[in-house]
């Protein structure tokens, strides 16, 4: 299950993402105006309250906590496409979106960053591609210096987490 879906079930994120303004100005615009790779838009949702677990049978948390959430569409990489997306175009799209995600987090003063799999699960995106893009900005470009902690979504996407860990360990 995608990280955003888990957050929607465990917090008030869903209500924030379904505000009439966002539906009218972001989702509807995205459907009409973007190509097959979707939109580069990011939705910043500050102060979302996580109040229950994301277990099969959810359990209320004894101490709810707040997080800021960045929502950004991952390009849909369907390996069964009639016309595959050129690898350069796909890499450019991931690089652009990952840079935007990190810059929005930095601009809003995020101390901690949890890296989702960004399409490496249900969308079949190459873990090496996504991990490589994160590494480029976090390590090579020094974006990691803006955060106190950078964590992986430990509960999901082991294949992606291994690729990310391997690339992040190659720090110079």
Regions found by a protein language model. Give the residues of each.
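Macrodomain-like recognition of ADP-ribose-binding/processing modules
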Residues: 1-113, 117-172
């Amino acid at each position: 299950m995608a990280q955003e879906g888990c957050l929607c079930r465990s917090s008030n994120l869903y209500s924030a993402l379904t505000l009439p303004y966002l539906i009218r100005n972001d989702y509807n615009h995205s459907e009409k105006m973007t190509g097959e790779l979707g939109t580069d838009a990011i939705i910043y949702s500050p102060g979302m309250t996580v109040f229950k677990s994301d277990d099969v049978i959810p359990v209320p948390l004894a101490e709810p906590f707040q997080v800021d959430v960045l929502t950004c569409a991952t390009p849909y990489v369907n390996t069964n496409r009639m016309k595959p997306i050129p690898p350069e175009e796909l890499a450019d799209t991931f690089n652009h979106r990952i840079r935007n995600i990190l810059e929005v987090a930095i601009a809003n003063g995020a101390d901690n960053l949890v890296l989702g799999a960004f399409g490496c699960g249900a969308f079949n995106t190459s873990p090496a591609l996504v991990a490589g893009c994160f590494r480029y900005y976090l390590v090579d470009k020094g974006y990691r210096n803006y955060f106190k902690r950078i964590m992986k979504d430990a509960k999901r996407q082991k294949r992606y987490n291994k690729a990310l860990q391997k690339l992040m360990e190659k720090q110079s």
